[in-house]
Amino acid sequence: MTQDSEVLLWHTVLQRHRNYVHSCIGDFTLDRSSLATAEADTTSVKGPRSSKKRKELQLCLATQDCVELYDVSNGTLDALGKWPIAATILSMTKLNMDRCSHTILVLITDSGNLTFWQFERDSVSGKVYVRTLANEPISRSGIRRFVPQYQMVSDPQSRCVFFSGIERSKMCVLADWQRGKLVVGSPIEIQRSDRITLASAACDVSFDNPVNAAIEVESGTNDYYLSFYTMDLGLNTLLLRKEHLLEDKSINFVMQCPNLQQYKIKTRPNDETDQDSVNPFVICGYDGYLTLIDLEGFYEVSVQLPVRKTVSSTNIINGTIHKLKKDFFILMQSNHGDMYKVGIIPDEETKAPVLEIAYFDTLPTSEDIHIFKSGALFNVSEFGTSYLTQFESLGEDLEKITSYTPGRRSFIETESTLKNLSILDSLTSLNPLTSFHASNSTPLTILAAANQTENLVKLTSAVDFEELISTTLPRIPSKLWTVRIPKNETHSLIFLSMETSTTILKIHEGTVEDFGGDSNPFILNKPSLFVGAMVQRSIIQVTRDCLLQIIEMHDGPYTKKLEWYPPAGVGIVTAFCNETQLVVALTNHEICYFEIIEDSLNELQDRVEMDSTVNSIALLAGQKSGYCVLGCEDSSLQILNLQSKHPDFFTICAIQSLISKPHSLLFMRDTSDLKIHVGMKSGVYLSSKLNINDGTVFDVRTRFVGTKPVQVNLLDNIDINHKDDDDDEPGENDSKIDDFKKKISDFTPLVVLNSSISWVTYEIDDKITLRPLKTDEGITLKHINAFITDDIKRNGCCSITSKGQLLIGKLDNFLSWSNWFNEKKYTLVNDELKNAGNEEEDEDEDEDEDEDASEKYEIVGYQSQRILSDTTDNSLSYVISKTANKETSLSAIRDDKLLATNNGNTVVIIAKEVFNAVCSCNFGTNVKYIVISTESGKFIVIQIRVKNNVLETQYIHETMVHSKVNAMVSFGDKLACCILGNVVLFGLGKKQLLRKSITEMPPYITQVTALDQWDGTMLAVGDIRESVTIFKYDIDNNSFIGVADDIVKRHVTTVKFIDVSSVIGGDRFGNCWVLRVNYESDTRVASNIKACQYTLETLCHMYMNDTPMKFEIVNHMNMSDRPAILWIGLQGTIGCFVPLITRKEQQLYQSFQSTYAELDVLHFQDNNKPEEVDLEETEGALDEAYHTTKNTDHQDYVEGVISRVGRDFLSYRSSYAPSKNIIDGETLEQLTTYLPSDQRWIASKMKHADSGKLDIFNKYINEMRTNYV
């Protein structure tokens, strides 16, 4: 960046946070093939009742701005889709209406609308889309305490939705399913002044008038009430039916109970005559006990909670009901994670309700818990990991406490091992995320401080190559082919082309052995140029002066059927074949063409003479390829027509120039397109499409992938969604069809690019993904091919390395745009402390370790962590952690490996106090130092030595500064920090740190929260309230001079220089901004010596809905041609800013963004166009003609269907200040999540001249991910 350049940034989210705050379960997806049938059923207003029995095996989770859908029917969390929205979700519930076969999702957001969603599944692709059924306005946009948008619950019979604000307002909206469509009534409101709502629940009253129970506080008297509100369906009015004054003010929780009459429990005394209506019950949670209360006030039954001895307060925070055939039970969780099984049983004599409770198990503290009909339980954790568990027991033998003895107390002891549950699957979370370090290497690797006890997370943006077999070859091969006869399901031969010979390996019964001897008909004393398989049993081997056709006989051996030689003095350059076609390129620039019929190889008499030597050939895999792609030495790509009935058969029909000579080619069919992949000798990878009608090449894209020539290879039959635990155990299910034959739609063609770094590219979710391929110890692959055997049924591959190794393995952990990183956890444990308590443990525990693995959950403990990069060694990082004993520990990581001390410890205690801030610096020497600022106002200096990957630490000294320092930074050969209103530079002394410079700061800087420096000359100071101030270091006077400050108050959390006069930062409210010194703003009064001369102007601004914690600049991320700015959010967000450099890029994406923000308006205009009316026939009725619109059925049109919640994303991104100079790529990337018809309509509205088609728009969006991220 330069001072005069305009900053325009592209922003996208690489990993979304998982702070789940809302959830519900149901049958959400509707097959789109049955949608038309449902809409066509208009025989009656109501329509037929749904006869489908709901399984409710789908889980809907929501963060503040994203909805996720999972299927748990297979015992795992299978993701069906993610849908970010441009609003903050305040509450969420569901509706299971009688005449609707699927579940409707209901959302309340700060857009001011009540939104109803329908999930539709494509029966062909299996992809799930969202359709907005209604956006019912209930208030203005924004978050207000009087607006009913917080507590939302749905009637158990799904007739209406109750919701209330924090104060005063309560509302009810009726909903029904008629003629295959959702009908939503107008909101009905009730006002309760001076009432604050703490919690609410919808009562089960069968088909009586819906009832809502709420815990309320009278703000004037501080009295607590349990209030019951009734929606009178006859009067269409929301009424207060009854309220109970509560004496105990520790109440915090309320949940509904089932209709107890169905379980032979008396709900009214015998003398009560009104037995027809249902008397609903609720359970209220107090500090240490539960109470069962009914609406009429006849019963109030209490029972004590089993509590821990070490805690003083226990409160219920969530609960769920699970109904059995003739019974039910309630599962509740306390604020300590303890789960209780609660039951309501009838008294043996009076049949009055009796409350019983028992301790069930312990899980991490959750926002909510859900029980599925399959016997699985899911806890929705806002922090840490959420678990999908299976009931091993219902706890029938648990010790129970009943309401017969309401004063009885019981104490429990908990463990990290589950007793009645076993873990099936989990969703990990990085929330809270406070620090990270990103490497400048490829692939992008991030060390993230997730603040979880004894854990450190490494995130890698690469596909994993899992090595199974490795062997070193006697000579380094140049090429590799794996041969699978089309009639066989597994590979049988491996060909290795050496410099002067060919080696053949045979796969037999799971072993790889040398294939040689006199019976071998293949050529072994010459290097092979090409090896391939044709028709059912033919193998083609091509050398420089010979072409062989080898037939595999039925009884096993191979025999030679054809031996073809080129003309005298002419050699073969290269060749390629598919199942029926073979093309050979000769040194005299001629192209020979063969076709095989019934194992007979027939040559076409005509030959094509090229202007240049052909060094690579590609055909479509399969029976017949209509075109052949030729790569020529004159840096061109030429298309040869092979359509026998075409008038231009066997002629060049198209030519595409390249930027360098091609090295390898690949021609394949991907979904509906023909694609060409070209690896060039300059290290550039090119992909393009081929027009199937005339053979022309279009949609050309290039990417630099390495410093060596690029070898492209195809791996077909790759299952991207495959998991290792899906494999059958040996000996089981032998009668089943092999995995790779089950579903053709499950497989995705994958292209591997081998250069100085290996890459893979594939299409997932209609988006192109290009990611590095990560191997063990960074091995560079040279050539790779598919490899399927009886032991490796899916994703297997065989490759050779640049060092002459033969690797057999499989590809795993594929990435997508919504899942950009693979996660790995490091365990940070002091081995001495760990082993001290385990010396006398029984040796048999090791045998039970695998059995208990599914019964242990991660104890959610938080420790403050900071990750630092060494100032001189980029491969070395430090992890500073707070221990459970309130000490400070250090761990070091180099090249993805934890370094250990001479004693074998990976964790070293470096201070007996808790750190507050840390900094890595060298004080102008070659020695590594860590400076720790403690809570007591000390600076502790630790020296670090790393020799032969052995970590050594040494305490140097400590310095009292008598102030709590929150931020430090290495400044040249000194340490910069802010102490008591001064900028202080420290130098290294023998006994303590020495103050080298002290500069007084302006008085408005009161508490410094962030510091950063630029090249030892500029210092940026971020204040907790007064934004950023930039200082310049005056070397002559050894002091700092104030250069610029901000006129806007910002609560700074982090700041980072991006050039000498510009900084990027974030504030505590979730905004990211770029500030630059405005040197034209010299309007300050000279007499005010403490004020800065210039001001900072805001270049960029955008609301992110996550508090930025740290920024890092990564130069040439994943070998891109420009730097990127990575940032992390407190809730676990990982985002990326990419500068848009060219004017064309800036105009293009600005046009996309402005049009995207107007889509709701454009959609409204397209659906409400005035009809053309003949003025002569109207006879002056202009007013009536003026109001005639195209869409006469206004109920079919839904406002805000494109934004999904009725709010454009630019308004959302401008929550605190207008969005400026940042392209919201995260929103533009969501195009493929819309219905196909909406995708085409959106693409047609883009204003750019070339963006009228959907694929063109997708191309521009894909370029940002594939080229720069």
Swiss-Prot record:
GO terms for biological process: mRNA processing; RNA splicing. SUPFAM superfamilies: WD40 repeat-like (SSF50978). InterPro entries: Beta-prop_RSE1/DDB1/CPSF1_1st, Cleavage/polyA-sp_fac_asu_C, RSE1/DDB1/CFT1/CPSF1, WD40/YVTN_repeat-like_dom_sf, WD40_repeat_dom_sf. GO terms for cellular component: spliceosomal complex. Signal peptide: none annotated. It is found in: Nucleus. GO terms for molecular function: nucleic acid binding. Coiled coil: none annotated. It comes from the Eukaryota. Keywords: mRNA processing, mRNA splicing, Nucleus, Spliceosome. Associated with the spliceosome. Involved in pre-mRNA splicing and cell cycle control. Belongs to the RSE1 family. This is Pre-mRNA-splicing factor RSE1. It comes from Kluyveromyces lactis (strain ATCC 8585 / CBS 2359 / DSM 70799 / NBRC 1267 / NRRL Y-1140 / WM37).
